[in-house]
C-alpha cells in the first residue's frame, strides 16, 4: 500500500468518556480552588511563616490551573469564540505564573532543605537537653538523698548511732540487699566486720588488711565495683540465689586527731581507713549507676567527718569525766588540807597558850629573882634561865608567825609610823649585844629617806632586827654597818629574782636596806638554804651559834608580803656577807603624822620604877606569878579565880584589872561587858587589861570590841610589867602589837 499523508478522521464523541472528563475537570477545579483557601487559612494562623509572597504565587498558579480546568468544561461540546478566547487567556496566564513560580522555587528549595536540616539539629539538641535535664534531675535527686543522709548522720554525735544510721539510710535510699562496715583493728593489721544492715549483732569476722581488693579500694577515693566472691563481700549466704547482686566498696577515712587518743580506735600514726561494702539485690538485672556511686562517695566523706566529730566529743566527755574526778579528788584533798591546817592551827593555838603560861611563870619569877641579892654564880644562872626563856618565847612566836604566813591568815597592819625611829630603835637594841662581842655597829640613813612612812612598823622592825641579829650572831670581831636609802629605779631589779617587778609610783617608794658584816661568811651554794624553814648550813659558826632556822624564812615571807625582795651576797667562808632587802612603803600625809589609835612602845625616861599603894585586881590561871610581879612593884594586889568572886570584889578603888580572857570555864569577853554594865561612868571604871597567851589578831579585835583598854601578851617580866603599868596610868590605853 502506498503510504499516504492523511489525517485520521475525528473519532466520534463517546458520551461516557465525555461524562468522566467533565466530572474530573470539575473536581480538579474544585481542588485547585480549595487549596489556596487552605493555604490562606494556615498562613493567617502562622505568625512566623517567612514565605508569604511565595504562597501568593502558588495560590495564583493553582487558581489559574483550576480556572483552566473549569473553563475546559465548556469545550467538550461546541462552543463559541468567546469561550476559546477565555480559555486561551487563562492558559497564557497560567503559563506565565507557573514559569515565575518555577523560577522562584530555584531560590526557595535550598531554604526549605536547610529548614529540614535545622529541624534535625533542633531535634538532636532537644534530645541532648532532655539528657541534660535527666542528669540534672538525677543530680538533684542525689543531692536530696545526700542532704537527707547527712542530716540523719549529723543528727547525733554517738559513733555507733552514726554508723548504724548510715547503713540503714543507704539501704533504704538505694534499695540494698546488704550494707556493711569493716573497721580496722587496734593493731591495724586486720579489718573486722563491725556493722551490717541486716544482722543485729554481726559475728566478728576479720580479714587481712593487705588483701589485693582492699588495697585497690584504699588506694582510690572513688567507689569501686568488686567481685561478689570477695572476702569482704561474703556478708550473707548465697544459698538459693542464682546470680548475686553487684557489689561496690568505698573507703571511709579515719581522720587523724592529733590532740585526742580514742580508746578503741587504731593507732593513727599512718593514714587509716574503714571499708564500706554495699550489695544490690540478688537475682536482679539492676546495676550501679554513676549517680549512685557518687552518692556513696559523698556519704563516705560525710561519715568520716561525723566520726571525727563524734570521736572528739567522746574524748572530750571522757576528759570532762576525768577532770570531774580529778576536781572531786582535789576538792577532797583541799578539804583534808583545810582540816589539817585547822587542826594544826588549833594545836598551835593550844600549845601557844599552854607553853606561854609556864613560860610566863619562868620569866616572871626569874626576873624577880634577878632583882634580889645574888652571888655572881647565882646571877649567872638566873641570867642563863632568862636568856633561854626569851629564846624559847621567840621560837614560839616564830613558829606561829610562819604558820600564819603559810596559810595566808597573817595580814599586814598598815599605819603611819616614824621610819627613822625604827632603825634607831634597832640600833639601840642591838648595840649592847654587839658591844659584848666587841663589834662596832654603824647606822647610815640617807638624807632623802622619808621620816614618816606608811606600812607595817612591827613587821619591818622584825625584819631589820632579825637580819642585824644574824650579822651580830655570826660575827666574832670587826664591824657591822646598817644602811638605808630610797632605791632608785635602776637598782631595783635583781637578776637573781626575775619574778620581782617593782613599779614606780608617786604614792609609794621602795626602801633598800643593806646590812654588811665582817663575820664568818657563807658558801655561795648554801645561800638558798638560808631562806628555807628549819634549814641550817653546815658551817661551824652556824652550828655553834644555834638558832631554829626560822628567822630568814619568816623574813622572806614578810618581805614578799611587802611586795619586795631579799637576798644575801657572800664571797665565801671567812669573807663576811651582805644581806639586802627591798620593801614597798607608802608616802605619809602630813595631816596623818603621829595620829595612831594606840601606842605600841613606851619611852624609857617616862617609866616609873615603883607603884606604891596601886590597887590591882588579878584573875589569871597563873595568878600567884602575876601577883608576885605586881607586889614587887609595890602594888596592892587582889587575886580571884571565878566570875562571881571577881564581880563581888571589884570596886572603884581598883585602878587596874588584869584578867586572862582564856581561862578554863570563864568567858573573859562576857565578863568585860558585865564590868562596863556595872561601871557606867568612864572615870569610875578601872582600867581593863587582857593578859593572854594568844597572839592571834582575833583575840585583840575581840578585846577592843568589848571595850577593854589594853592587851598584854604573856610571858611578862618585871621590866615589861613596869613599862605596862607606867603606860596604863599615863594614857589609860595600851594594846601590845601582835
Swiss-Prot record:
Q: Which residues form the Histidine kinase domain?
A: 350-589
Which segments constitute the GAF domain?
A: 158-307
Q: Where in the cell is it found?
A: Endoplasmic reticulum membrane
Any note on cofactor binding?
Answer: Binds 1 copper ion per dimer.
* Sorted UniProt keywords: ATP-binding, Copper, Disulfide bond, Endoplasmic reticulum, Ethylene signaling pathway, Kinase, Membrane, Metal-binding, Nucleotide-binding, Phosphoprotein, Receptor, Transferase, Transmembrane, Transmembrane helix, Two-component regulatory system
Record bears the keyword Nuclease: no
- Domain Response regulatory span(s) in chain numbering: 612-729
Keyword Transmembrane helix belongs to the record: yes
Question: Mind listing the GO biological process terms from this record?
Answer: negative regulation of ethylene-activated signaling pathway
List all membrane-crossing ranges: 23-43, 54-74, 92-112
Annotated residues that bind Cu cation are located at 65, 69
Chain positions found as 4-aspartylphosphate:
660
Enzyme class name: transferase
The reaction(s) catalysed by this protein are: ATP + protein L-histidine = ADP + protein N-phospho-L-histidine
Which GO molecular function annotation, any one, does this entry have?
A: ethylene binding
In terms of superkingdom, the source organism counts as Eukaryota
Query: Which sequence positions carry the modification called Phosphohistidine?
Result: 353
Q: Name one Pfam family in it.
A: GAF
InterPro entries according to UniProt? CheY-like_superfamily, ETR, GAF, GAF-like_dom_sf, HATPase_C_sf, His_kinase_dom, HisK_dim/P_dom, HisK_dim/P_sf
Cite the record's note on assembly. Homodimer; disulfide-linked.
Name under which the protein is recorded: Ethylene receptor
* Organism whose genome encodes this protein: Prunus persica (Peach)
* Gene assigned in the entry: ETR1
Amino acid at each position: 500500500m502506498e503510504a499516504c499523508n492523511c489525517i485520521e478522521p475525528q473519532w466520534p464523541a463517546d458520551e461516557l468518556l465525555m461524562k468522566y472528563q467533565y466530572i474530573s475537570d470539575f473536581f480538579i477545579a474544585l481542588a485547585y480552588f480549595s487549596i489556596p483557601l487552605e493555604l490562606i487559612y494556615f498562613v493567617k494562623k502562622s505568625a512566623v511563616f517567612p514565605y508569604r509572597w511565595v504562597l501568593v504565587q502558588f495560590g495564583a498558579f493553582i487558581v489559574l490551573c483550576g480556572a483552566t480546568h473549569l473553563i475546559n468544561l465548556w469545550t467538550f461540546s461546541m462552543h463559541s469564540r468567546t469561550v476559546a478566547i477565555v480559555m486561551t487567556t487563562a492558559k497564557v496566564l497560567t503559563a506565565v505564573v507557573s514559569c515565575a513560580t518555577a523560577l522562584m522555587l530555584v531560590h526557595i528549595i535550598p531554604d526549605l532543605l536547610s529548614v529540614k536540616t535545622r529541624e534535625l539539629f533542633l531535634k538532636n539538641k532537644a534530645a541532648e537537653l532532655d539528657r541534660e535535664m535527666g542528669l540534672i534531675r538525677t543530680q538533684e535527686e542525689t543531692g536530696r538523698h545526700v542532704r537527707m543522709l547527712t542530716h540523719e548522720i549529723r543528727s547525733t554525735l554517738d559513733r555507733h548511732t552514726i554508723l548504724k544510721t548510715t547503713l540503714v539510710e543507704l539501704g533504704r535510699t538505694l534499695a540494698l540487699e546488704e550494707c556493711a562496715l569493716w573497721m580496722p583493728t587496734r593493731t591495724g593489721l586486720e579489718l573486722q566486720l563491725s556493722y551490717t544492715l541486716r544482722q543485729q549483732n554481726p559475728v566478728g569476722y576479720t580479714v587481712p588488711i593487705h588483701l589485693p581488693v582492699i588495697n585497690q579500694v584504699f588506694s582510690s577515693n572513688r567507689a569501686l565495683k568488686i567481685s561478689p566472691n570477695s572476702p569482704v563481700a561474703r556478708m550473707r549466704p548465697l544459698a538459693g540465689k542464682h546470680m548475686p547482686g553487684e557489689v561496690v566498696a568505698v573507703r571511709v577515712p579515719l581522720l587523724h586527731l592529733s590532740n585526742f587518743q580514742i580508746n578503741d580506735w587504731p593507732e593513727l600514726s599512718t593514714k587509716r581507713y574503714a571499708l564500706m561494702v554495699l550489695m544490690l539485690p540478688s537475682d536482679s538485672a539492676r546495676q550501679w549507676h554513676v549517680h549512685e556511686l557518687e552518692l556513696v562517695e559523698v556519704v563516705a566523706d560525710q561519715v568520716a567527718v561525723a566520726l571525727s566529730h563524734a570521736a572528739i566529743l567522746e574524748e572530750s566527755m571522757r576528759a570532762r569525766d576525768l577532770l570531774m574526778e580529778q576536781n572531786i579528788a582535789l576538792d577532797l584533798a583541799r578539804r583534808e588540807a583545810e582540816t589539817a591546817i585547822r587542826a594544826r592551827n588549833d594545836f598551835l593555838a593550844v600549845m601557844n597558850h599552854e607553853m606561854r603560861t609556864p613560860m610566863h611563870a619562868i620569866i616572871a619569877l626569874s626576873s624577880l629573882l634577878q632583882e634580889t641579892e645574888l652571888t655572881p654564880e647565882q646571877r649567872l644562872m638566873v641570867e642563863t634561865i632568862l636568856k633561854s626563856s626569851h629564846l624559847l618565847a621567840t621560837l614560839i612566836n616564830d613558829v606561829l608567825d610562819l604558820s600564819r604566813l603559810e596559810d595566808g591568815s597573817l595580814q599586814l597592819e598598815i599605819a603611819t609610823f616614824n621610819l627613822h625611829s625604827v632603825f634607831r630603835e634597832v640600833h639601840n637594841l642591838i648595840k649592847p649585844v654587839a658591844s659584848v662581842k666587841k663589834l662596832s655597829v654603824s647606822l647610815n640613813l640617807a638624807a632623802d629617806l622619808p621620816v614618816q612612812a606608811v606600812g607595817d612598823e612591827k613587821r619591818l622592825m622584825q625584819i631589820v632586827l632579825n637580819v642585824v641579829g644574824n650579822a651580830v650572831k655570826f660575827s666574832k670581831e670587826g664591824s657591822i654597818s646598817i644602811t638605808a636609802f630610797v632605791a632608785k629605779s635602776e637598782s631595783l631589779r635583781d637578776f637573781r629574782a626575775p619574778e620581782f617587778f617593782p613599779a614606780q609610783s608617786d604614792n609609794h617608794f621602795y626602801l633598800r636596806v643593806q646590812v654588811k658584816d665582817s663575820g664568818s661568811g657563807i658558801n655561795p651554794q648554801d645561800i638558798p638554804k638560808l631562806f628555807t624553814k628549819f634549814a641550817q648550813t653546815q658551817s661551824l659558826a652556824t652550828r655553834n651559834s644555834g638558832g631554829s632556822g626560822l628567822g630568814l624564812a619568816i623574813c622572806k615571807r614578810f618581805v614578799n608580803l611587802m611586795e619586795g625582795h631579799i637576798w644575801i651576797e657572800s664571797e665565801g667562808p671567812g669573807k663576811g656577807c651582805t644581806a639586802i632587802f627591798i620593801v614597798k612603803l607608802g608616802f605619809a600625809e602630813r595631816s596623818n603624822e603621829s595620829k595612831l589609835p594606840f601606842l605600841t612602845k613606851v619611852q624609857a625616861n617616862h617609866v616609873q620604877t615603883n607603884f606604891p599603894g596601886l590597887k590591882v585586881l588579878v584573875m589569871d590561871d597563873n595568878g600567884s606569878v602575876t601577883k608576885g610581879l605586881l607586889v614587887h612593884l609595890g602594888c596592892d594586889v587582889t587575886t580571884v579565880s571565878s566570875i562571881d568572886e571577881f564581880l563581888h570584889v571589884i570596886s572603884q578603888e581598883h585602878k587596874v584589872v588584869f584578867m586572862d580572857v582564856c581561862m578554863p570555864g570563864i568567858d573573859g569577853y562576857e565578863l568585860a561587858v558585865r564590868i562596863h554594865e556595872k561601871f557606867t561612868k568612864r572615870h569610875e571604871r578601872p582600867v581593863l587589861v587582857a593578859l593572854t597567851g594568844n597572839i592571834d589578831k582575833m583575840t585583840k579585835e575581840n578585846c577592843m570590841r568589848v571595850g577593854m583598854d589594853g592587851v598584854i601578851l604573856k610571858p611578862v617580866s618585871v621590866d615589861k610589867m613596869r613599862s605596862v603599868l607606867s603606860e596604863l596610868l599615863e594614857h589609860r590605853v595600851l594594846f601590845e602589837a601582835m
